Amino acid sequence: MADRYILAVESSCDETSVAVLKNEKELLSNIIASQVESHKRFGGVVPEVASRHHVEVVTLCIKDALSEAGIVAEQLDAVAVTYGPGLVGALLVGMAAAKAFAWAHGLPLIPVNHMAGHLMAAREVQELEYPLLALLVSGGHTELVYVSEPGNYKIVGETRDDAVGEAYDKVGRVMGLTYPAGREIDELAHKGKDVYDFPRAMIKEDHLEFSFSGLKSAFINLHHNAEQKGEVLVTEDLCASFQAAVLDILLAKTKKALERYPVKTLVVAGGVAANQGLRERLAEEITDVDVVIPPLRLCGDNAGMIALAAAIECDKKHFADLDLNAKPSLAFAGFEE
């Protein structure tokens, strides 16, 4: 049987990435052009700046991905692209590049949900056993997803307000930490103590929804009041207390979901899955199912994960026409025509 090659393009936010996947899960290349330095001074992603950077580098990323993979365009079998969710301008740049490439080389186009990419990044670790449950945690999303079979996704719980990664960045900004703040807060938390009493919203309620806005507000109020009174707060303890509250919420809801949906595998993915505190708590507290977390290099936004998700859609022959539109608010409902 001939080898199958898929070129994948990801541009949903502030990373321009192109990857080449051989067969089901062998990543031959995964080029990532990060824009973090460009957005740091703004304390967050500026959509117009992100789109401009994507335009500047996406063609070069495609060339580099093919070169590193050691193949030429004529060997490709399909082109995959993130079509949502994400920033509409950023999505459109990657989609335009992918559609043009697919048209020029007569290749089918595979539309991929960005969050399916995060989830399916776990395929590089091991073959996944279905049905499974996934905790997806990133800058824009916090959701529990039940996957009955490859490509069939159902949200069973999600945040009512802030995503967990968004909360990290907002409290990081209050403390004067560099954007994105997640890694630094995690590192500082390991040096501090959980001494500040922050709320754990809805932690004892029976549903599977999350809320982080109250925790974020409590943190901001504590920090503001201390500044007004001239009090000095220990940054390491602030981070430890904030992270303890976040992880208590995530673990409590995940455990409830596992009780409700008896599965053998829990996938934890998304940018926040790189958090060492989260990984430690998962290892300590969830021992009756197989916990699968993508390697650090596949936790943040990257085209490798899009390619891994695309392989499943390709198997099902889920292709799109070249008039495919970006869906910035795309929700998990499996494949959308």
From Swiss-Prot:
- The top EC class is transferase
Question: What are the binding positions for substrate in this chain?
Answer: 136-140, 169, 182, 186, 275
Q: What is its EC number?
A: 2.3.1.234
Subcellular location, record wording: Cytoplasm
Chief localisation class: cytoplasm
Which InterPro entries did the record assign?
ATPase_NBD (IPR043129), Gcp-like_dom (IPR000905), KAE1/TsaD (IPR017861), Peptidase_M22_CS (IPR017860), TsaD (IPR022450)
- For this protein, what is any one GO molecular function term? iron ion binding
Q: Which family does this protein fall into?
A: Belongs to the KAE1 / TsaD family.
Task: Give the function comment from the record.
Answer: Required for the formation of a threonylcarbamoyl group on adenosine at position 37 (t(6)A37) in tRNAs that read codons beginning with adenine. Is involved in the transfer of the threonylcarbamoyl moiety of threonylcarbamoyl-AMP (TC-AMP) to the N6 group of A37, together with TsaE and TsaB. TsaD likely plays a direct catalytic role in this reaction.
Record protein name field = tRNA N6-adenosine threonylcarbamoyltransferase
From which source organism is this entry? Streptococcus thermophilus (strain ATCC BAA-250 / LMG 18311)
